[in-house]
Each structure stands twice: as C-alpha cells, then as structure tokens.
C-alpha cells in the first residue's frame, strides 16, 4: 500500500492567510469544550486555533461561568458564546472542534454507557452532528470517548490517542508501521472518516490516501499535546481541506518539539508548543 510523506514541500500548499481581504477572510471557527474538571484543554485549543483564523468562538457547558473566567485569565483572543446560541455560531463557522475538556465519564467504556456527565456530552455532540452533518468537524477529547463511530458525521476528523482509538474502533493500533498504516486506511475508508494517529510516525488517512508525518521526540508524551493538534487542525481547516489540515497540524507540532528539544531537552510542555508553533510556521515563509 502506497504511503506519502508529509513535509515542508506539502506545507507550501497551505492556503491560510493567502486570500486576506475583510475582517473575516481568514475564516471563523467554533470550539466547544471545557468543564469544571478540564478547563486547560480548551485553552490550548483556543490559543492554537486563534492564531490561524479571523474569529474564534468558544462555547462551554451551560452554567459553568467560572470555566470561562478561568479561560479568559489565560487568553482573550476569543468570543464566548452562550450554549443557547451555539447553533448560530456553528452554522456560520468554516470549521468546528468539539470535545476538548468535555466530561467523558463511563460506566462501561466499549458500549458507551456513560454517567450523567458523559451522557450530557453525548447528547450535545449528537444534537450538533444531526443538525450540521456537512460541517467540517474535528472530533476529539470528551466527545470522541462518548459517541459511537457510527454517530460521527461522514468526512469528519478524529484524532484519537491509543486508548480512544480502541474505544472508537474496537481494535488496538497495530505496532508495525506498515500494518498500522493499512489499519488506519481501512478504518477511514470503512467509516468515511479522516483519522490522525499521534505516534512517533503519525498516520493520517481519509480512506483514499495515506500520509506519514515523521519527526518529533519523546517530549510529545506530555498531556495537552493532543489539544494543541486539535486546535491547529480546526484553525487550518478554516482555509484548507481537512486531510491537509491534520497533516499540517501534526507536522507543525513535531517541528516545534524538535526546536524546543534543541534548547531545553525534553523539559517542555503543551503551553511551550503553542508558543513555538508560530515560529515554526513563520520560518516556513509560506
């Protein structure tokens, strides 16, 4: 099975910031996430996405105003929207990320039986998927852990870690790279999704093509890295197709990790990645 390598040559195809005109010409995205337990995840996603688009809208769980205050303390480049208004903003957004920091408690993982908090996340996610099946979706975090693969809109991006991969697809990621590439390709084709794995060699496939993203280092095992990738993916998706966006997001994060490792070894975290990714992007002279 033929695989292709995503590198700087591919990055040069990026359409972000190529057609700048009015205030909204770089695109608009909505991010839905956050909870009393997980308010760091959406901050990382918001920071990553907001540097790539004209407008970033954020919706958090209804009634959890403290979540918004905590997030605003670390970031001001977004517009908070009330849960009752989320449909309107999803409708006008070019791409939507759902899941970072949403509650995902399970009673029974493989059959998606959830407690009250997980059930709320599931209800919200399914409602939006039903209303906006044609939207560019990036599905991650809490949502990815409480919905069945058949619930996810066709053409959507999923960015599972190894545990989430097994939960969603019912099988473990294979160890061998060639076997894993074929596995991801077949699952993407079967379910009509775009899958991005987060490995030493990350794999992205839409069931038609297989792209390999090499690089990075052991510093990427830190918590929050997936939220950075998800945020970059939705930001890039405002101006690019989804398969390119996830490949580019993975590439930028891996290159940022390499740059940080040169300066401080593996003593960096997801916050550091968010700050260094723009330097990597700028250095590409796109």
Over which residues does each language-model region extend?
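Charged C-terminal helix
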Residues: 74, 257-286
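Glycine-rich phosphate/dinucleotide-binding loop and adjoining beta-alpha-beta core of small-molecule
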Residues: 2-7, 57-215, 282-286
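Positively charged, low-complexity intrinsically disordered leader regions
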Residues: 1-23
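Short, well-structured alpha-helical segments that form the helix of a local strand-helix-strand
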Residues: 180-189, 242-257, 270-278
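Short, small-residue alpha-helix embedded
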Residues: 167, 222-252
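Substrate-binding N-lobe of the ribokinase-like
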Residues: 18-82
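Glycine-rich phosphate/diphosphate-binding loops and the adjacent beta-loop-alpha structural elements
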Residues: 31-34, 100-107, 237
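Short pre-catalytic strand/loop immediately N-terminal to key active-site residues, enriched for Gly-Thr
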Residues: 212-224
